[in-house]
Amino acid sequence: RKALEQEVPGLAPRWQAGLLFEQDGQIDNRRQLMRALEKACVSLGVQFLEGAEVQALSRDNDSQELQQISLRTAEGEVQHHPCRRAVLCSGAWSQKLVPELPVFPVKGQMLSLQGPRKALKRVIFGPGTYLVPREDGLIVVGATSERGTGFSAGLTPDGQAQLQAGIQDLLPMAGSWPPMERWW
């Protein structure tokens, strides 16, 4: 327990052991990451069509191999692009394009707290909750995992209560830190 407290001061007393992942990392600025990824892809010949919506994936009737994608551009023009492969990254909406995929929405709610700088130095994963420290003391708390909610928008009292309970279960002192933002 003593070694655990040295790694995570203030950890709730019920935790007697933990796993340390020395190489665990995080990205604080996802926008910079995505810009760098886009730049690398473009340098390899990838074309991005921003604001375009894929309408259909057409497959060969016999082999079921992908033949083309049909999309509507941001300007409303319908285009057909022959291809043998496509990256499907539409998340919970993927089933609209490939109905046989067993994909469904799972709602996640999160919040952030403003803690003292360096109050938490490591990511903490607990049952149903995790705490991610940022350099400025901000702590990202996540996330609920709510099946059966469909694509419902908004925060729920139950989801927010679950996050608060997770904070108390992992790092009780964080329960007194002011909330900064809540999202789903």
What are the residue ranges of the model-derived segments?
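Flavin (FAD/FMN) cofactor-binding and adjacent substrate-gating region
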Residues: 1-44, 49-50, 56-65
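Glycine-rich nucleotide phosphate-binding loop and flanking beta-alpha elements
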Residues: 34, 93-96, 147
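Conserved beta-strand-loop-beta-strand element in the redox core of flavoprotein oxidoreductases
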Residues: 55-81
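Structural motif
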Residues: 63, 68, 85, 110, ...
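Central helical "cap/lid" subdomain
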Residues: 76-125, 153-159, 173-175
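Active-site lid/adjacent beta-loop-alpha segment flanking the redox-cofactor pocket in flavoenzymes
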Residues: 118-184
